[in-house]
Amino acid sequence: NNPFEPEIERYYQLKFKAEIDGIPYRCMFDALRVDYKNKTIQPIDVKTSYKPTYNFYKSFIEWNYAYQCRLYARILKLNIEKDEYFKDFKILPYKDIVISKSNMIPLVWDCDFTFAEGILYLGKNNQIKLEAPWEVGKELWYYLSTGATVHMGINIESSNDLRTWINKME
C-alpha cells in the first residue's frame, strides 16, 4: 500500500464464496485494489507466460480466462451486495497483469466484457464463442453430482435425434 494514497488499499489472495443458480462457487483473487474515496474495487489477476506479453490476448482465448474474470467478478458482486459497508462500491472491469521471461516487460490488459451476460461472440467474424461461466458451471455440476459420462441431454438408453442436435449447432 502506498502512503501517498491513503484512500487506496490493496488486498491479496482474498477468498470468496457464492451460489449462482443453486451451484456453489468459490474464488481467490490475486489482488483487489479498493479505492475507498471513489468507492471502487478493481479486481486484478497476475499471469505469467512463456509467450511474449503482447500476445496475451491469444492465451486469454486459448486458456479460457474469460471464465475466470466473468465468474470472479460476479462472485465478488454477490458478496459486496450483502455487505452493508461495500454494497455501494462499484466493481471495475478485470485487469490482467502479464509478465513473461521472454521479454520481462509486464503489460496490463483490460477485460471490458467482465460483466457481460450470456454468450459472447468475439473475433473479426464472431468466430470465438465464449459461454457464460455459470452456464458451463451448470454442466460441470451435472457431471460432478450425477456421475454422468455423456453430455447433458444425450440418451444412453435409447436413440438420440440427429436433427435436434444438429439444430443446436452454431
Question: What kind of region is each of these model predictions?
Answer:
Residues S59-A66, L71-E170:
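Metal-dependent nuclease catalytic regions and adjoining charged, substrate-binding loops involved
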Residues S49-W63:
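Short helix/strand-bridging catalytic loops that position acidic/His residues to coordinate divalent metals
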Residues N1-T53:
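Catalytic cores of nuclease domains that cleave nucleic-acid phosphodiester backbones
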